[in-house]
Amino acid sequence: MAIRVYKPTTPGRRNASVSDFSDLTRSTPEKSLIRKNSKTGGRNNYGRMTSRHRGGGHKRQYRLIDFRRWDKDGVPATVAQIEYDPNRSARIALLHYADGEKRYIIAPEGIKQGDRIETGANADIKPGNNLPLRNIPTGTVVHAIELRPLGGAKIARSAGAAVQLVAKDGAYAQLRMPSGEIRNVDARCRATVGEVGNSDHANIQLGKAGRARWMGKRPITRGESMNPVDHPHGGRTRGGKPPVSPWGKGEVRTRRPKKASNKMIVRRRPNGKNRK
């Protein structure tokens, strides 16, 4: 994928860039693999806001992505199309399996139309193939990794994401996450070889507020710039109080300090001046 940079013909075009979509081979999705995707505007079933800065945006159809490929062990597939997915930053690949079934997967870097894809413990180590971590050589870059066996891919699914298998220790495999954290994962968990494609997605500049609104993102306003009636930080007399949400809740870390999965973390991600 390449980035197309606009000339500054208008203020909205200045510094704006888009994908040229040259890596796509099809413009319409497979009808049997799309579902309705309703918007919530950041509200729950009571109509109360639970996630700020969300609302509006273009309508989307949800593409059913196969994150559990273990039921296709030993069934080869061919990459039929590389498609755009409005619901994620990565591209998706349409697979035609030898048994006649069609499925979408996250498109790895370097995959192209006509490639052969395999699933199972005996699959070759090549981009797009899915197999257990215990069958993957140390040092291999992988993505779409399960956290629990047969639980479906949870880690490294966005554009350009890559995780390195750094070691194997008994029943566990050690993975270096994109954040720099090293974590133990059950060696029976599945992973897909290669990194996620569309890595240039991070270099796209929206250029104007309107493009963010097309994506369903609403403006972010600081509490200090509001009036006291609208936010606890509003007005000129905040008085050094700790930061809170518009509803007065303290802005604290949301991860439980005694979370059971903490024992799976071998080395924490670097932070502050130690981050590379």
From Swiss-Prot:
One of its GO terms (cellular component) is large ribosomal subunit. InterPro entries: NA-bd_OB-fold, Rib_uL2_dom2, Ribosomal_uL2, Ribosomal_uL2_bac/org-type, Ribosomal_uL2_C, Ribosomal_uL2_dom3, Ribosomal_uL2_RNA-bd_dom, Translation_prot_SH3-like_sf. One of its GO terms (molecular function) is transferase activity. It holds the Pfam family Ribosomal_L2. Residues 16-27 have a biased composition (Polar residues). Residues 1-58, 218-276 are annotated as: Disordered. SUPFAM superfamilies: Nucleic acid-binding proteins, Translation proteins SH3-like domain. GO terms for biological process: cytoplasmic translation. The keyword Manganese does not apply. Part of the 50S ribosomal subunit. Forms a bridge to the 30S subunit in the 70S ribosome. One of the primary rRNA binding proteins. Required for association of the 30S and 50S subunits to form the 70S ribosome, for tRNA binding and peptide bond formation. It has been suggested to have peptidyltransferase activity; this is somewhat controversial. Makes several contacts with the 16S rRNA in the 70S ribosome. This is Large ribosomal subunit protein uL2. It comes from Bifidobacterium animalis subsp. lactis (strain AD011).
